[in-house]
């Protein structure tokens, strides 16, 4: 397989074509940003850590029957993934109140949410990823009823799998976002799962172990990413 020209460059990853039209190379970079790109930095080893972390999680999900675009690791920073027709909707599950939920609804950080909440956001940087609902998605043609139902079902299946995984490793999976796409019409998990796109707290101390360390200037961002991975069994 040959890596060809760059197709897309996002905030922290780049996608490259290959000589197989159905496969892409996903490259994880050291770039880090927060607050819609207002705060930016390069964190040494971040690309390598997130690449291996994502490979571990995606493999666990695939073993549990979740359809994923991840195929295999290619290098320290690169993974081979299946080509998806992306659905421009982010699915967010919150097990514990934190971040924007607290600001929007005036609830205290750390409140356990039973049952977990489920929210949809339009993936659009210019509009700052506004919250939407199923009616918007259908009206504007972003997703069909069947796709929305499958995305929701898969998102909660992922929650069941990963909550248990993190809990057994002494951590709380506070919240996370997922993105989906289509392969021959089948809803499939895309993008990545890493501490960049979720909140993780130490169960014993409540210490934040995710991208909030960058957002809130808590320091040792990558060291905590690696600690999360080591507890789960990721080989760095």
Curated annotation (Swiss-Prot):
Coiled coil: none
CDD domains for this protein: SAICAR_synt_PurC
Pathway in which the depicted protein is active: Purine metabolism; IMP biosynthesis via de novo pathway; 5-amino-1-(5-phospho-D-ribosyl)imidazole-4-carboxamide from 5-amino-1-(5-phospho-D-ribosyl)imidazole-4-carboxylate: step 1/2
Keywords from the UniProt entry: ATP-binding, Ligase, Nucleotide-binding, Purine biosynthesis
Enzyme class: ligase
Pfam families per record: SAICAR_synt
Any one GO molecular function term: ATP binding
One annotated Gene Ontology cellular component of this protein: cytosol
GO biological process: 'de novo' IMP biosynthetic process; cobalamin biosynthetic process
Keyword Ligase (UniProt): yes
Record-listed E.C. numbers: 6.3.2.6
Keyword Ligase: yes
Reactions the enzyme catalyzes: 5-amino-1-(5-phospho-D-ribosyl)imidazole-4-carboxylate + L-aspartate + ATP = (2S)-2-[5-amino-1-(5-phospho-beta-D-ribosyl)imidazole-4-carboxamido]succinate + ADP + phosphate + 2 H(+)
Matching HAMAP family: SAICAR_synth
Entry similarity comment: Belongs to the SAICAR synthetase family.
Protein name in UniProt: Phosphoribosylaminoimidazole-succinocarboxamide synthase
Organism: Hahella chejuensis (strain KCTC 2396)
């Amino acid at each position: 397989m040959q890596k060809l020209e760059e197709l897309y460059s996002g905030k922290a990853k780049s996608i490259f074509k290959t000589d197989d039209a159905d496969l892409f190379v996903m490259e994880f970079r050291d770039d880090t940003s927060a607050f819609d790109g207002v705060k930016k930095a390069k964190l040494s080893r971040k690309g390598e850590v997130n690449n291996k972390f994502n490979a571990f999680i995606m493999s666990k999900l695939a073993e549990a029957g979740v359809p994923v675009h991840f195929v295999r690791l290619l290098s320290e920073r690169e993974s081979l993934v299946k080509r998806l027709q992306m659905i421009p909707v982010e699915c967010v599950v919150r097990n514990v109140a934190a971040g924007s939920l607290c600001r929007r609804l005036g609830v205290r950080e750390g409140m356990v949410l039973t049952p977990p909440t489920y929210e949809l956001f339009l993936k659009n940087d210019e509009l700052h990823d506004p919250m939407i609902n199923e009616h918007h998605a259908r009206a504007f043609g972003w997703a069909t009823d069947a796709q929305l139902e499958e995305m929701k079902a898969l998102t909660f299946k992922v929650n069941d799998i990963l909550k248990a995984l993190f809990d057994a490793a002494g951590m709380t999976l506070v919240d996370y976002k997922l993105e989906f796409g289509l392969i021959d019409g089948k809803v499939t998990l895309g993008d990545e799962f890493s501490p960049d796109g979720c909140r993780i707290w130490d169960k014993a101390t409540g210490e934040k172990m995710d991208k909030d360390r960058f957002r809130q200037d808590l320091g040792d961002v990558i060291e905590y990413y690696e600690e999360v991975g080591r507890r789960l069994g990721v080989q760095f």
